[in-house]
Amino acid sequence: MANLEWVCVPRCYEVRKNCLTGQATLEHPLKQRTVTVVDSNPLSRALEGTDPLSQFARQDDELNDPLSQMVSEFDLKSKRRERDRTEPEDNTLQWSSRRLGILNRFTTNEKLSLSTSFLVSSGSLDGGNESIKAQTVVADKTKFRLEQLDHFDDGSMRHMMDLTQQEYIQRFEQLKQELIQSWHNDQRVKALKIAIQCAKMLADTTVLQFYPSQYVLITDILDVFGKLVYERLRAKASGDPAASAATLEREREAARDTCQNWFYKIASIRELLPRFYLELSIFKCYEFLSSSREEYERILQRLTHQLRGIADPLVSSYARCYLVRMGVTLTSSKTYIRENFADLFLIYPQIFRFVARFNLHPEIVTASSYLQLYAPAFDYMLLCLVHKSELHTQDILNECKQLKNNGAILMSVLSSFNSEFIATNALEFIALINASETPGISKSQLLRSLGSCVSSCPPLQEQRVTFLKAAFETINKLTDPNEYINCVETWAVFVSQYFTIHEVNRLLGELNTRMCLGKAYEKHYSQLQNILTRIMQNYRSIELLLIQPNFLPYLDLFQKESVRVEVCKNILSFYKQNSDEYTCDAVVTNALMYLGKILNDSVNALSVDDERRQIAQLINVFIHKVHFGNDLEQQLSFYVEARGTFSNLDAVYVTLVHAACKLATRNRSKSTGFVKACIAYCFITIPSIEAVQQQMNLYLLCGQLALQHLCLGQADACFEAALQLVNELPAATVDFDGKPRSLEPFLVSYMCNILATLIVVPDSPEQGVLYFLRLLLEVVGRHKFKVDSSAPSIIYLHSLDMLYVQSLERFPYHIKGVVSNDDLYGHDPKFLQEVNNMCAQVVDAILLQLKSLGVAQQQRSQAELALELFLRIVKYADLERETIAQLAVNLWLLANKAQSQLDVKTLPQTLRSVEIIYKQIKDASPIRAQTIAKLLLRVRSS
């Protein structure tokens, strides 16, 4: 439509803002509304509610005395607690919290053996029962009990050899289930025999390194047996609550007799070890015979004396552990535990006779591994001794000093005694460790245990320096790098938490020196990393740590790139989490730049997006925290340095551009030199960013910033660069979920944004009238859109809006200090003619889009575009010109053809919009109003 004569008409009405009328509301407008529908069956309405008897029962409950209810609830809870209490109420002494750790710690690859008669069909076995036939002589009763316990069918004994650890554990689980099943089948003696056979196995130390786990498995079965006996006796003693007092007393007497019978049976066992373990397994049953704490203590002392007959110190130690474990459930006395330790210290030298033997035959078990077998037993016994009582702590420590080869006991003391006691006697402990020479227990092990204790509870303030010096005198004498680094790993928490930065720096320096010898650091990356992590976790200021002379040399120990990168990530993560203040310290900044450069250099073509994103986020955090106050030039210099350092990370470049733009807004001087420097920095940085979208957005941002600060030349350069990138924009991008996402919506939004900005951009004398708009239209014309896309039509329509604004005498908005085209041209007729010509070109482009949509059979989109152009012709163009008026009518007819595909309200609303325009201008411009009225008549008549 080359002969189209477009003439923009002046706006002859005032734009008014219509305020939205408010309305009071009692509910939040975004609150979700829920409707509850109750649907009931009419036939069942008569049965709703509760029956009268239930109502009476409820009323009786409600009328109960509240105190009576409280008493009944308390009694119920007390009974439940008593029923469930098989271990000490204090979680510290509960064995169940330790058993899993023992099973995981003490394992073996050796083959195990097991001898039992209860994992085969036992039809020939006499299950027996717990009742004993009435005998007239006590000797006959004893003989009968022995016959019951000795009645093992030798032919049924099964020796299982070459079992793996897992198979061995499964066999014990089967034995446990067999015991439970026998008990519930009223085969009490069979259950007792299973328990005896299991207890006998505790004398077997063939596979030494598995003995603690073997002890756990067997005592689990003994615990089950003891619980079954106790529960049966308790059920007998409780009786029927409704029975008379005499009946209840007879039942309690019968329970006492049965209990005594169980202890007589166990006392008849000939071998010491199973007799000892079985009596302890039902030790809780002494409650039915006596409630005296003194009696319990007397029994425990008797059992302690029996243990003097066990020769093997390992078997003896775990038997004492079982004794203590059962004793703490009934008595809080510590006397029997102290006596056990007195006996233990007597047999303690025997342990090292075994150690000397294993030193000659390390293929069996090493001395260190053998001594570790005692740790669970010693630890638990010591813990029970000092729990809620420090009566014997000093005595144990004094006896420990007198012992030769006291390392094993000292290890357990450090792991079991209260940290407060250890902290109070810290110098005494360090002297004891320095003097200790125990085969199998190295000083590094003792020092690690002591370091863990003082990290949670430090020594007195005046003793700390002396204590630390004494400790590190010993640590620094360790020649094995593995022992040295393991010690320092534990002590790093103590040093960083309770000492100044100078001690931390000295520690890092000593580590640098020791680990560089023979490149020892190559084998200890994990420990070195843990040391650094613990220091950062416990020291107060990460910035103060970064400026220490030995900090960056410490990082040089991590020569392996993957470890080095992980360490740098860790440091920057701690800086991100624990540094809330800005920094301008040059040393801190250089350290952060050094860390960031390591991360930046690790990024390559094979790096995944998540890795890039994580690294960029860490670097961006410290870039934001580097702040030089009012020294803006120094801040910009830092950004320049950062740009050269982090060349592999687009996200960092985006952050730097935004930071430079923000820096430009802080300029308070009247000179625009610094702002120009910031814009120039951004203009140079943006092309290095790979993503075209981000480049376009940043160019537009920088152009708007330059325009606001009256840097017109730089603004023009930014806008031109942004428009030149449009044809490099890909058609689609990949979303986070892997699906392709079209970029046409982004392009439409971007073009609308830039058109709104170009309204106030003055024309450059070198480029001609409306250069940027011409460039925009040219770029849009070259861009490849989808065939059925509405994106170019929307851009052209908004371009028409922008051109109409250019024809106005006064633009709707301005930027202070910028001479826009309304002031620059002063409504010059030549300028208006250029605007009208461009409007005609834009309309021609829209008409071509209409034709393309028709060819593509997109009638709905075609009709909507026709109506949009129709309204703009009515608003902006001179309808007195016949070509314009006829074009408007043709557009209406085109839209009317697709009426069936449009919303029913679309056409009527369009006509109402034309009527509103007519009402707005009829007083100010009657002639133009008359042309609109004629157009309405032609439209309605068509």
UniProtKB/Swiss-Prot annotation:
Record lineage: Eukaryota, Metazoa, Ecdysozoa, Arthropoda, Hexapoda
Protein name: VPS35 endosomal protein sorting factor-like
Assigned keywords, A-Z: Endosome, Protein transport, Transport
Keyword set includes Protein transport: yes
Location relative to the cell: Endosome
GO cellular component: endosome
Binding partners and assembly: Component of the heterotrimeric retriever complex.
Keyword Plastid included in the entry's annotation: no
The protein's role, per its UniProt record: Acts as a component of the retriever complex. The retriever complex is a heterotrimeric complex related to retromer cargo-selective complex (CSC) and essential for retromer-independent retrieval and recycling of numerous cargos.
GO biological process: endocytic recycling; protein transport
Family as reported in the entry's similarity comment: Belongs to the VPS35L family.
